[in-house]
């Protein structure tokens, strides 16, 4: 498979061959679903907690005597049926939400997401941004040239690309990650992918 490579002006400068096993497979919906659920589960802090009857402050003595008042018997004003009482079977921080997805399925999900973007023509490859020092204005100009400014965009670059990281971090709807930080949620959450040519090579080294 061949994909167009653009320059910072949005002009096609060449074509490169990419691995069909990464960019041209039939997207596996179940693998992508499982990987997204697993990633979202791992993002949960799990610090939720409610107090039981024994943990709520107060309620140490019986509110009224057992017999003779005509009212229902009560042992504590912190029993669950009382306002301000303890919670029965509430959430505790001991609950674990982690879901396991094996490496093979996770790789299949990433390849499926890449292939889906290619099929939908929602991926662009850029040779270089041509930005010498951090500049949000310069990055916005490049995105305008590529006609993706205002889109929910994921930029994938390589390690050590501090200039482009700093140039894009204040732009609304733009997220930038390295090829080593690729994850299924960011890929599917973005409407468009903008990948550097060097990142394409790094991705193919890992996922081939």
UniProtKB/Swiss-Prot annotation:
Transmembrane segments: none
Top-level taxonomic group: Bacteria
Coiled coil: none
Listed GO biological process terms: translation
GO-annotated molecular function: rRNA binding; structural constituent of ribosome
Keyword flag Heme: no
GO cellular component, one term: ribosome
Entries under SUPFAM superfamilies matching the protein: Ribosomal protein L4 (SSF52166)
Signal is among the record's keywords: no
Keyword field: Ribonucleoprotein, Ribosomal protein, RNA-binding, rRNA-binding
Residue ranges of the region described as Disordered: 42-77
Protein's job: One of the primary rRNA binding proteins, this protein initially binds near the 5'-end of the 23S rRNA. It is important during the early stages of 50S assembly. It makes multiple contacts with different domains of the 23S rRNA in the assembled 50S subunit and ribosome.
Family: Belongs to the universal ribosomal protein uL4 family.
Subunit structure: Part of the 50S ribosomal subunit.
PANTHER family: 50S RIBOSOMAL PROTEIN L4 (PTHR10746), LARGE RIBOSOMAL SUBUNIT PROTEIN UL4M (PTHR10746:SF6)
Name of the molecule in the record: Large ribosomal subunit protein uL4
């Amino acid at each position: 498979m061949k994909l167009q490579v653009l320059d910072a002006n949005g002009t096609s400068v060449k074509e490169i061959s990419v691995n069909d096993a990464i960019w041209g497979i039939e997207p596996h919906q179940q693998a992508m679903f499982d990987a997204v659920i697993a990633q979202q589960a791992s993002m949960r802090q799990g610090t939720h907690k409610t107090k039981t009857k024994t943990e709520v402050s107060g309620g140490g003595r019986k509110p009224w005597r057992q017999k003779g008042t005509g009212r229902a018997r009560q042992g504590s004003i912190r029993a669950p049926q009382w306002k301000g009482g303890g919670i029965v079977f509430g959430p505790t921080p001991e609950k674990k939400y982690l879901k396991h997805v094996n490496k093979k399925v996770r790789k299949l999900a990433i390849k499926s997401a890449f292939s889906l973007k290619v099929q939908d023509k929602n991926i662009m490859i850029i040779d270089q941004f041509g930005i010498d020092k951090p500049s949000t204005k310069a990055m916005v100009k490049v995105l305008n040239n590529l006609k993706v400014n205002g889109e929910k965009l994921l930029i994938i670059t390589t390690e050590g690309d501090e200039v482009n990281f700093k140039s894009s971090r204040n732009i609304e709807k733009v997220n930038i990650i390295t090829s080593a930080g690729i994850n299924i949620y960011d890929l599917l959450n973005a409407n468009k992918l903008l990948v550097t040519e060097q990142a394409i090579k790094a991705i193919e080294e890992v996922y081939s």
